[in-house]
Amino acid sequence: MLTLKILVYTVVSFFVSLFIFGFLSNDPGRNPNSKDFE
């Protein structure tokens, strides 16, 4: 049960950080410099 809870928190934290990173990199994403990350 503890392992499942840790797994859930890990997945949730991953998606939250991924969403925040995508939201923050959305503004400079319109710049030509964004092509370097792809």
Swiss-Prot record:
Keywords: Chloroplast, Membrane, Photosynthesis, Photosystem II, Plastid, Reaction center, Thylakoid, Transmembrane, Transmembrane helix. This is Photosystem II reaction center protein I. The chain crosses the membrane at residues 4-24. It is a single-pass membrane protein. Coiled coil: none annotated. PSII is composed of 1 copy each of membrane proteins PsbA, PsbB, PsbC, PsbD, PsbE, PsbF, PsbH, PsbI, PsbJ, PsbK, PsbL, PsbM, PsbT, PsbX, PsbY, PsbZ, Psb30/Ycf12, at least 3 peripheral proteins of the oxygen-evolving complex and a large number of cofactors. It forms dimeric complexes. One of the components of the core complex of photosystem II (PSII), required for its stability and/or assembly. PSII is a light-driven water:plastoquinone oxidoreductase that uses light energy to abstract electrons from H(2)O, generating O(2) and a proton gradient subsequently used for ATP formation. It consists of a core antenna complex that captures photons, and an electron transfer chain that converts photonic excitation into a charge separation. InterPro entries: PSII_PsbI (IPR003686), PSII_PsbI_sf (IPR037271). GO terms for biological process: photosynthesis. Its main location: plastid. Belongs to the PsbI family. GO terms for cellular component: chloroplast thylakoid membrane; photosystem II reaction center. It comes from Ostreococcus tauri. Disulfide bonds: none annotated. NCBIfam families: PRK02655.1.
